């Protein structure tokens, strides 16, 4: 388009605007202003969110790979002056990372698997079967989402003490196997919403083929609910991985990563200085604590990077966004 054509087009637009009502002209001006301002506003919001999310991670990485003397150097901000892996190695040795990681995975993966099975069966029952007290029981499920775990922790402790399972993995496995583990309420709700969205004709066809309720659940429902199973599995893994409150109540010697990081200062003092009561500068502790946090979150970050797509699809199909 040459200059003359552009000039003619602008003149036509001016003539057209002169013929427009004042209300329409005012609307066009507001729309033009909005179209100009909104991209800038959106960019600022996204930049702020990125800063809030990425700043702790970048700070963690920066501190984990520097010497503790760099923490007292005001000229060192982001890039370490003395790049080293000593903090990572010392923290891993102090945490007994190998045994702690194995213990954490044993509780995490096992409880997550048990909780998936138990909450899936419960959610399927609420979605497809009619029985007395169904609404009341589902209200209890909603209360499990709203009521904090601290409310039932003391009765649970008395029960487990009577059973003789305190300081064993059974204190985590038993609630998971009975659909009462960490955040079990939201998992039941996810499965219920997903199973309610599946067509009833699937079960009718299975019934005509001679399948009972349990076989229908195994053969028809589970294959169609794999996205929800993956979503609940990721939720369960993250919540069990980060839990220290429940573990701290029931464990005195079984160590998990979350428990170790919660008590990281005496652990570091005992391992590095042979004195659990030693006082070290809080700023110097940062390199070890950030190294411990980095080692703890790395598996979760890697899992999310590789499974993000499936996780998002599962959330959308479960109905939590609708």
Locate predicted features:
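A structural signal for multi-pass alpha-helical bundles of membrane permease subunits
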Residues: 31, 38-322
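Short, Lys/Arg-rich, polar N-terminal cytosolic tail immediately upstream
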Residues: 1-33
